[in-house]
C-alpha cells in the first residue's frame, strides 16, 4: 500500500496490524496515515484548504444554501468539507485531524461573496496576516497567503463561478480569531502582523504526534543510507536528487531520525529547519529575522558554509544538502 500524498510504501507488517478496515481505506485514500504499530491517524486540513472551502461555498451560496463543498487539493487529491453558506455568506472551521498541537484547530474562516461584472477577485480581510517588510518571496504589505493555497483558493472560486453561471464574483475572506491566534504562532517573529498565514503546500496537515514519530523512526531505521527531509518542498527535490534512495519526511523530528539512521545519511531540504537544528543561533548578529531571508542574501555562503563544515567534522557520516524553493542546491557539506 502506497501513501498517495508522500509516495511512501507502507510495509506489509504495518498493514497487517490494522484492526479497522474503514481506517485502512482512509489510509489508502490519503486522508490518514499508518504508523508502525498499526494505528491509523487522520490528516487534517490546512488553513489554505479551509479558506478555499469558505470562498467556494460563498460563491455557490449566491444560488442557494450550501452545506458541503469539494476542494481539489494541491497534492492532487480531493477533499469534502462541511460548510455553512447562505446568500453569499459562508463559514468553514479548520479541521486539525489527529494533530492535538495545532493552534489553529477549529478556527473559523468567513467568506462574503458579491456578484461582479466579470472574473474573480479575492480580497484579504481582517485576521489574515500581512508582511511588514520585503522578503525573498513577498513584498511589504502583501497578505500572508502562500502560492499553493492561493492557487487552490482561486481555482475553487473559478469552479464555483462556473457552477453558478455567474460572470464574476468578489470574495472577502476574513478570520475573526486570526489576530489573536497569530500571537501563538511564529508570525510576529518572522515579520507578519495582523493575523495568521494561509498556508499548505499539499492542502493537508500531517498528524505529527508521538505515534507518527515512532513510524518516522521506523522508516529511517529500516532504510539503507536514507535521505531525511523536513518538508514537502524538500521531499519533492530530494526524490529528484536521490532517486535511488529511500527519502523519509521527518518534519521537525530531525534529531530522532538521524539517531535511528544507518549507514551514510543525507539531510536534504530547505535551509530554515535544517540550519536552525544544526546551529540554533545562526541568526544572531546577522540582522535577519528568518533563515529564509538570510539564505537569499549575499552573506549566506559565508555564514552557512562554516556551520556545515563544523557539523561534518562532528558527524562525518551525515551529508547536508540545502536547496531553495526552485530546487537549486544552495549549500552542501564538503
Curated annotation (Swiss-Prot):
Pathway: Cofactor biosynthesis; adenosylcobalamin biosynthesis; cob(II)yrinate a,c-diamide from sirohydrochlorin (anaerobic route): step 6/10
Domain of life: Archaea
GO biological process, one term: anaerobic cobalamin biosynthetic process
Enzymatic reactions: Co-precorrin-5B + S-adenosyl-L-methionine = Co-precorrin-6A + S-adenosyl-L-homocysteine
Keywords, comma-separated and alphabetical: Cobalamin biosynthesis, Methyltransferase, S-adenosyl-L-methionine, Transferase
Isomerase keyword on record: no
UniProt entry tagged with the keyword Transferase: yes
One MF term in the entry's GO annotations: cobalt-precorrin-5B C1-methyltransferase activity
EC number, UniProt record: 2.1.1.195
PANTHER family named in the record: COBALT-PRECORRIN-5B C(1)-METHYLTRANSFERASE
Family to which the UniProt record says this protein belongs: Belongs to the CbiD family.
Protein's UniProt name: Cobalt-precorrin-5B C(1)-methyltransferase
Natural source organism: Methanoregula boonei (strain DSM 21154 / JCM 14090 / 6A8)
